[in-house]
Amino acid sequence: MSDEVLCAIDGGVATVTLNRPGQRNAMNTALLAALRARFDELDGNRDVRVVVVRGAGPAFCSGMDLKEMEARGGAQGADPESGVIEVLGRVERSRHPTVAVVHGDAIAGGCELALHCDLRVAADVARFGMPLARIGLVVPFVLGQKLLEIIGPAHTRHLLFTGQPIDARRAHEIGMVHQVVPAGELEAATQQLAQSIARNAPLALAGIKATIQRAISLRESIAHADLDEVTGRARRSADASEGRRAMLEKRRPVFRGE
């Protein structure tokens, strides 16, 4: 299987690691396919009780791979959000409880990956952000719903309208993160949490997860085709192209409302 996503199992705890450290674990096509395959594989493993998701290198995940997106046609290319949404949904539907361990930046799709896990533990130096407006993009409806579900309308507005990242302490204050620990204690805190889950009855864990998922799935019944079109128009806009180029070129974008 692809080295883009690694997996190790020990004592009922499966650790899934995004493994593109040189690209800050940006979500390219290969990583998304490997992540989906890992979760498919783990769902059939009866020895697994809990899945820990983490990133190699300095970042948890920096979101979509903008370089690949530009290479595939930029604003006129295939819809990149659909692939991310599909894989995030697969993570959320995992048969096992999932824990995101965020040691560095979790930005855009990386933030959403953490949110699509059941629990989140963060180092005090971690940051979370949804800077889509800063590159001319609109958050897809289903991902916006996940933010609303976890941090509520007021904090969702602030996070999306400003596009500014928040630190781990603030993320904990608004309910985005369950636990914040010093960076040097993150591994021990993760193991303690994972083992506290893993020693519980497997059928009970699966049943609890299924019950929660059924309640969450109600959001999928909301019609949002019109909002998907809004998202698509923004992605295809000149401003979005300018935003992506500016980020890759490490400069301030010049938006024209076009």
Regions found by a protein language model. Name each.
Residues M1-A56, G89:
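Conserved CoA-thioester-binding segment of acyl-CoA-metabolizing enzymes
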Residues S2, R245-E258:
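Terminal low-complexity tails and localization/encapsulation signals of metabolic enzymes
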Residues V16, R20, L35, V53, ...:
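Terminal peptide-recognition signature
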Residues G55-R93, A106, G136, R219:
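Glycine- (often His-adjacent) and acidic-residue-rich active-site loop
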Residues G89-L205, I222, R236-S237, S241-E242, ...:
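Crotonase-fold acyl-CoA enzyme core
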Residues L159-L160, T211, A215, E229-R235:
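Helix-loop "lid/cap" segments that line or gate small-molecule binding pockets
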